[in-house]
Amino acid sequence: MSLTEAEYHELEKQVNLDDIDFSDLEEQYEVDVGLDNYVVVDGAPIAPEAKVPVLIKVLKKLFNTVGKVVEGDEGIYMPLEDGKSKGYLFVQFETSEMAEAAIKQLHGKKLDQKHRLLVNRLSDIEKYGVEGNVAAEFVEPELPPFKSHGYLKSWLQDPQGRDQIALHHSETFGVFWNKKKSDPEPVFEPRKFFTSKYAKFSPKGTYLFSIHPQGVQSWGGADFSSIDKFMHNQVRLVDFSPNEKYMVTLSPLPITAPDSAAERAVFPFGPESYGHKLVIWDLTTGEPARTFALPPHLEGQKEMPWPLVKWSHDDKYCARQGPGALAVYETPSFQLLDKKLIKIDDIVDFEWAPAGVHLANNKSENGHHLLSYWTPESSNQTARVAVMQIPTRQILRTVNLFQVSDCKMHWQSEGKLLCVKVDRHTKSGKTIFTNLEFFKTTEKDIPVEKLELKEIVINFAWEPKSERFVIISRLDDGNLNSAIPKNIIDFYAPDVNGKGKSATSVYKSYKTITDKHSNTVFWSPKGRYVVVATISRSNGEIEFFDVSFDDSNKNAPANVKLLKNDKFSGMTNISWDPSGRFVATWSSSWLHTIENGYKLYEFTGNLLRDDSIDQFKEFIWRPRPASLLNSADRKKVRANLREYSAQFEESDAMEADAALRELIYARRRALEDWKAYRAKHASKAVKANEVQAEIIEEIKEEIIEEKEEIVE
């Protein structure tokens, strides 16, 4: 039965289509009209129409590396105008996930020297390109109000001159005032999950940094308020320039663009940083100053050499090592010095001088920037150690070495001396022994003194601002039984012969201690006192030495005396406080769970505290900046040292005994009350006894001589 046209229209009027559910049909025949699988690409080369097919073929091959481009003409559309391409194109992938991968991996990709591709979602272009979605006139962003963090070096104003320490145990982290034998005093309430890995002070103590999955957080001021955030996903390692201007972070994950446009708007990295893992941050602005990809030979390594970026003493230069070359950058531009690498075949390692060096033939007020490096032996050349001046790249001194197994470079704190520890092997290769090569950088032509040893040196440490040093060595006799103590401790100092310009010096061991397990050396930052320790899970030991014990003999270069020693099973770390007054040792749960906790000693070895703390991780002294006192100020302090010592001894006694502290405070209050009472009543007594004075002038005559004469 068929309906006439009139009957159909009548029936249509009777049926309400809004009451009919078409959802099943709509779902069955749904058509995808979304744009999520489309991307728009800017920055492509502008090519003549005849070469467009070739360009499309090249680009399609590139985009197929991250997904699958739709086949045919629909896959890539490149608009033309006036017989040439317009520099952008549209790419359609089979899925939105492929388009997302293209944005993350190819945004910022350099196609050649002149062209960098910018890949974005087509939906974002539509969103921001539609009229009305973006304001026609520029609206100046509102700057957030300035937030003061207080005086960032406020801890230096402590009346008692105390140092601050950071204690990290389990998931709790806190900063405290060191109170010697007493419990540390919290600077702020210790916090749980303050950091997800570890925390670190900047080299001069201005900032405290915590590590998180999202990046690094900086803290500072009297109450350690939040200062800045540095976004670097899954950051693992952190380092700083000596003057706290820059921070270096490393993550195992390459930098990629965030998913959303809103996140990309606040993302600190540009397309040129995508794929990089190493970031140098400007701590003043909080922005990245430069990013780097890891060298190919470091990709995939389980143990990463650190730091990857090394700094000159004044933050003026930084350098990083690559295969067969050294890259030196100038700050703050972080451009290559002279726009080229320093070619050094097979370079193994390098170190900057830790201070400006005053060369004998080229005086400079602030000293010169020097760095040292070494290269290994090859079939046609010997191993080589060289000292180079920056920025001239001039090689100032070279020493050729043979039968070399390894080298370690140790700069003296003032840059006046460089010791190169050269581990050499016999011709058979069965025995290792050490030579020490001393470069005297401030003397004419940088002479080199050699110290030949029969043993292999396992630890070397310079005394700060001195020419003395300590080494730990052992004889390489093939006996690998670690239970037998066979390490040797030697205390060296220069033995000077002659006077004036004709004087010569050679290094001489002034004390030797044999049959030890000791394996580490830690000098006081102020010199003279040194800790020699055995860091071991089972037989930890620490010994305190004074290398200038007999002050009566001023001409003796060294006079070594053992002050004290102590046992600490499971000891993993040792650290001096910045003032050289205290030494902290601790057992970290990061390495084992044996007797976790810390011990605090005076510089003479007297034990002050012994705290066993479950899951104790780390003890950190807060560093101090260099002293502002000049030589005259220091001389004045030394002259009044007895007076200052009495004040500090009284303060120490008060801290140690609460009852004594209250007694001293009570006596001080009573003395102040007496002084106030006396001043008040003495003035009253003067007023009560005041009498109106009258000045009377009285002339007295005295006969000195009487003489009688007769006048005729």
Swiss-Prot record:
It comes from the Eukaryota. Gene3D superfamilies: 3.30.70.330, YVTN repeat-like/Quinoprotein amine dehydrogenase. One of its GO terms (molecular function) is translation initiation factor binding. Belongs to the eIF-3 subunit B family. It is found in: Cytoplasm. WD repeats lie at residues 191-229, 230-293, 301-339, 342-384, 452-493, 513-555, 566-604. Residues 1-98 are annotated as: Sufficient for interaction with HCR1 and TIF32. SUPFAM superfamilies: DPP6 N-terminal domain-like (SSF82171), RNA-binding domain, RBD (SSF54928). RNA-binding component of the eukaryotic translation initiation factor 3 (eIF-3) complex, which is involved in protein synthesis of a specialized repertoire of mRNAs and, together with other initiation factors, stimulates binding of mRNA and methionyl-tRNAi to the 40S ribosome. The eIF-3 complex specifically targets and initiates translation of a subset of mRNAs involved in cell proliferation. Residues 37-124 form the RRM domain. Residues 1-224 are annotated as: Sufficient for interaction with PIC8. The keyword Transport does not apply. Its main location: cytoplasm. GO terms for biological process: formation of cytoplasmic translation initiation complex. This is Eukaryotic translation initiation factor 3 subunit B. GO terms for cellular component: cytoplasmic stress granule; eukaryotic 43S preinitiation complex; eukaryotic 48S preinitiation complex; eukaryotic translation initiation factor 3 complex, eIF3e; eukaryotic translation initiation factor 3 complex, eIF3m; multi-eIF complex. Disulfide bonds: none annotated. HAMAP family: eIF3b. Component of the eukaryotic translation initiation factor 3 (eIF-3) complex. Keywords: Cytoplasm, Initiation factor, Protein biosynthesis, Repeat, RNA-binding, WD repeat. The keyword Hydrolase does not apply. PANTHER family: EUKARYOTIC TRANSLATION INITIATION FACTOR 3 EIF3 -RELATED, EUKARYOTIC TRANSLATION INITIATION FACTOR 3 SUBUNIT B.
